[in-house]
A protein has these predicted regions:
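Short, solvent-exposed loop/turn segments at the edges of secondary structure
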Residues: 97, 111, 135, 177, ...
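Acidic/His- and Gly-rich active-site-bordering loop/insert found
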Residues: 10-152, 171-176
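Acidic/histidine-rich catalytic neighborhood of metal-dependent amide-processing enzymes
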Residues: 146-147, 151-233
Length: 308
């Protein structure tokens, strides 16, 4: 009887594996967009602007816990000097001195606007790790087809990309259908209030956007070699987080006569229970679709199996 059960389970497992392999083989790559995008060569001025942006040490907090206002003032002047058409055709509003909102009026004001966001502040370079930098962190060196420095990937690249795109489109006489708002914060790295200030500013004006695009992912080649093509990662949500503050209120004691259960014992137990009670893991619809699209486009069998 036991042998029959084992044999049946083995047959079912074999059929299940065959089904997975069949589905993996049958999976077709997700159809690419039919839209053709003609990308113009990146102008040298854009590269220089990115390099210059990195050279401005807009550290959101220093060792003295006070921002370097001179650097943030320099950033404002840099934007005005580098993007004259943006400042000529868009309305620039300073929010609490160092955050900015640019309004680009569209042809159809009845449409809900789009918001493009980014931040130009960067984290400090700790003295203990400064020597590990292969290029000075605020040099903006252009070497080996790369622009080096703090903020090159978080997030001056995003801010400069938005400004370069806007400047180039304005140069060609482009006017968007929807109104666009370009919003740049100055204290994201320290979870500062500038984003809330911008939201309050927009809410007071009755602005309800169609979409908000903030920072974004990366275009990766090294991490997706099996695909044989670059992968652009578009984030559609943000992970949640929660912080707990645990406190114990218990009478004191003495090491010569320790209590059976001290405040530290109780706190340790609470921390242990908290650590061993994580939220249940789950795959949301966007994650499932991401895995399916990537897996079906991969030559890697493991990826294709995951897509099934």
């Amino acid at each position: 009887m036991v042998k029959k059960i084992v044999r049946c389970l083995g047959i079912l497992l074999f059929l299940f594996i065959l089904l997975l392999l069949f589905n993996a083989y049958r999976a077709k790559p997700w159809p690419a967009s039919a839209a053709k995008i003609n990308l113009r060569p990146l102008p040298d001025s854009a590269i220089q602007h990115m390099s210059q942006a990195i050279q401005i040490p807009t550290i959101s907090i220093s060792d003295s816990a006070a921002p370097d206002t001179a650097a943030f003032q320099t950033w404002g002047a840099f934007m005005e000097r580098s993007y004259p058409l943006v400042h000529q055709h868009l309305t620039r509003t300073c929010i609490r001195r160092f955050s900015y909102v640019f309004e680009w009026k569209g042809q159809r004001p009845e449409l809900a606007p789009l918001i493009l966001m980014g931040h130009y502040d960067v984290v400090p370079v700790e003295a203990a790790v400064a020597a590990q930098w292969t290029r000075p962190p605020f040099s903006g060196d252009i070497t080996d087809s790369c622009i080096w420095g703090r903020g090159a990937v978080d997030d001056k690249n995003g801010v400069i990309s938005i400004l370069e795109a806007a400047e180039g489109l304005l140069r060609n006489g482009f006017v968007p259908q929807r109104t666009l708002y370009l919003c740049f914060g100055h204290d994201e790295e320290i979870r500062g209030p500038s984003t809330s200030w911008v939201v309050d500013y927009l809410r007071q004006r009755g602005i309800r956007p169609e979409m908000v695009l903030d920072e974004g992912g990366e275009v990766s080649e090294s991490k997706t070699k099996e695909l044989g093509r670059p992968l652009a990662v578009i984030g559609v949500a943000e992970k949640g987080h929660v912080s707990f503050e645990l406190s114990i209120n218990k009478e004191g004691g003495h090491s010569s006569l320790p209590a059976k259960e001290t405040a530290i014992d109780i706190l340790n137990t609470a921390l242990y229970r908290l650590k061993n009670s994580p939220p249940p893991a789950r795959l949301t619809a966007p994650v499932k679709e991401f895995i399916g699209r990537i897996g079906s486009s991969s030559d890697n069998l493991g990826h294709r199996l995951a897509a099934t």
